[in-house]
């Protein structure tokens, strides 16, 4: 998570929760002249378009006042979807036993990309069984992690 993403998460968590939804996480994606702030929300009863619109309206008001982003960007609010991104230790705990794809910031055993089954979570470290071998990754070293859906 970048410094901006951390700042945005801290700024937006309370307003999102005030609408009755969980802020799963967010990504700020820079792509040349066009950037995107993607916010993932969830609720025990699921997410629909009205929920996304409600949270988008709330978040837009906060962003307009605080103005933390200095470049032009689009705001997207969505459910985490089938390939749910994992941001926090609690997310990994929730999905122990599920398959995950992980991209690391710094290589472990000369690899940055890993796929495996989430085995356990211990504080800020997760254990994943990859190709029959258990590997441990610090959450601070994970650039991106997504569940791999089973069909």
Curated annotation (Swiss-Prot):
Keywords: Cytoplasm, Ribosome biogenesis. It comes from Vibrio campbellii (strain ATCC BAA-1116). It is found in: Cytoplasm. Pfam families: DUF150_C (PF17384), RimP_N (PF02576). Transmembrane segments: none annotated. Belongs to the RimP family. The lineage of its organism: Bacteria, Pseudomonadati, Pseudomonadota, Gammaproteobacteria, Vibrionales. One of its GO terms (biological process) is translation. Required for maturation of 30S ribosomal subunits. This is Ribosome maturation factor RimP. Its main location: cytoplasm. One of its GO terms (cellular component) is cytosol.
């Amino acid at each position: 998570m970048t410094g901006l993403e951390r700042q945005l998460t801290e700024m937006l968590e309370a307003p999102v929760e005030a609408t009755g939804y969980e802020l799963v996480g967010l990504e700020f994606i820079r792509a040349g002249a066009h950037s995107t702030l993607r916010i993932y929300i969830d609720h025990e009863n699921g997410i629909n378009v009205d929920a996304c619109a409600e949270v988008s309206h709330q978040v837009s008001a906060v962003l307009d006042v605080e103005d933390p982003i200095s470049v032009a960007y689009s705001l997207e609010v969505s459910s985490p979807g089938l390939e749910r991104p994992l941001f926090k230790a609690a997310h990994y705990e929730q999905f122990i036993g599920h398959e995950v794809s992980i991209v690391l910031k710094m290589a472990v055993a000369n690899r940055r990309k890993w796929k495996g089954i989430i085995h356990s979570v211990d504080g800020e470290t997760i254990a994943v069984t990859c190709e029959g071998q258990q590997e441990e990754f610090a959450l601070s070293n994970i650039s991106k992690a997504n569940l791999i859906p089973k069909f």
